[in-house]
A protein has these predicted regions:
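C-terminal helical subdomain
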Residues: 196, 200, 208, 212-254
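A glycine-rich helix->loop->beta "capping" turn
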Residues: 84-98, 103-104
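Conserved active-site helix of classical SDR/Rossmann-fold NAD(P)-dependent CH-OH oxidoreductases
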Residues: 48, 132, 176-187, 223-230
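Hydrophobic positions on the long internal alpha-helix
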Residues: 134-138, 142, 181-182
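Rossmann-fold cofactor-recognition segment
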Residues: 63-80
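N-terminal Rossmann NAD(P)H-binding glycine-rich loop of SDR-like oxidoreductase domains
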Residues: 36-49
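Catalytic loop of short-chain dehydrogenase/reductase
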Residues: 100-104, 108-124, 144-192
């Protein structure tokens, strides 16, 4: 099914070209959408696109700094963020756009000789444990009827079946763990809210600070990546819950 798009125009100076907006007609009108990791390249673009859609009463962005701040590695902070969101209305769509490929000068491992316990623990804390805590505190707050979704941004390199190159031990393993956590949560969610969806999404190569040092090509702009992802989100329904999909909506091997 093709993305449902309408043209909108940014009236700000220097941004006169029309841009395409995903309408998200599969969601009930109103309620809330939220992006966790809202200040990153993809997160910021997703927040803007969700606002442009006009589908939701409010679009909230959570990040490490700002008015709606939270700490992904602190469960009390995660729980408070989820409670704050729930008090604002029905939660219809949450996108987890958090993630870490590497920190500082410590680049992704090319060999088992570079595996380090602290770096592995940090990768799992950000890429798997933090999102698991968000799932724990957000999924019980989704409406029991009507389409609602939590979508976690994963990565194709987290696919075990698609791994032909090796390397990147911490990032690959932590994203694979995220995929399993999403799948488990989706099974439990279906018992509580049969129309709800919980999925992992691969955004493709996007031109952000995270991918810049490693991408063979420049990647797509965050605005374009956001449009692709929201198009997939609009098309997915309860029968797709628990899956892992790329930016085209194609299933990615586990």
């Amino acid at each position: 099914m093709a993305d449902q798009l309408t043209a909108s125009r940014d009236g700000a100076a220097g941004h006169d070209a029309p841009r395409l907006t995903v309408r998200l007609d599969s969601f009930p009108h109103g309620g809330l959408a939220a992006v966790f990791g809202a200040t990153g390249g993809i997160g910021a673009a997703l927040g803007a696109a969700l606002t442009d859609s006009g589908r939701f009463d409010r679009v909230l962005g959570f990040s490490r700094c700002g008015d709606l701040s939270f700490d992904l590695t602190d469960e009390a902070s995660v729980a408070t963020a989820a409670e704050t969101l729930a008090t604002c209305g029905d939660i219809r769509l949450v996108i987890l756009a958090t993630g870490m490929l590497h920190e500082g000068t410590a680049l992704p491992e090319k060999s088992w000789r570079e595996v380090d316990a602290e770096r592995l623990a940090r990768a799992f804390a950000i890429n798997a444990i933090g999102p698991a805590l968000l799932l724990k505190h957000l999924l019980p707050r989704l409406p029991r009827t009507g389409k609602a979704m939590v979508a976690a941004l994963s990565a194709r390199v987290g696919s075990i079946g698609d791994n032909r190159l090796g390397g990147w031990y911490g990032y690959r393993a932590s994203k694979a763990a995220l995929n399993q956590l999403v799948h488990c949560a989706a099974i439990e969610l279906a018992r509580r809210a049969p129309e709800a969806v919980c999925v992992a999404l691969h955004p493709g190569t996007v031109a952000t600070r995270l991918s810049a040092p490693f991408a063979a090509t420049s990647g797509v702009a965050p605005v374009e990546a956001a449009r692709h992802l929201l198009g997939v989100i609009d098309r997915l329904d309860a029968k797709d819950s628990g899956g892992f999909y790329d930016w085209r909506g194609t299933p990615v091997p586990w």
